[in-house]
């Protein structure tokens, strides 16, 4: 499995490079969320977002994902949380929602 870490700030990318230089399966890219998704690198991959326990995707990486993949993605995340955990996703738990792209 290949892991891609990304950040738009060059100094942050340099720090990530230093921390992961011995890890063969980690790639650091200096790019914004939009640039990363538009590059096609994520075509067959998965995106992990820490999000929040209610599935509200209105800012940060979640906001970018909702803007790119639509409000239906947010609805699927919320539905997964409710179906599997009730009104709130417990700390440490996760749900999987397809982007349909």
Where are these regions (language model features)?
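Macrodomain-like recognition of ADP-ribose-binding/processing modules
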Residues: 1-101
């Amino acid at each position: 499995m290949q892991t891609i870490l990304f950040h738009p700030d060059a100094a942050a990318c340099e720090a990530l490079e230093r921390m992961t230089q011995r890890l063969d399966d980690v790639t650091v890219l200096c790019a914004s969320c939009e640039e990363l998704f538009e590059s096609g690198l994520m075509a067959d991959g998965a995106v992990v977002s820490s999000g929040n326990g209610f599935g509200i995707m209105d800012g940060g990486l979640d906001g970018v994902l909702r803007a790119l993949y639509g409000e239906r993605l947010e609805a699927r995340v919320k539905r997964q949380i409710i179906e599997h955990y009730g009104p709130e996703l417990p700390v440490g738990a996760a749900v999987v929602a397809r982007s349909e792209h």
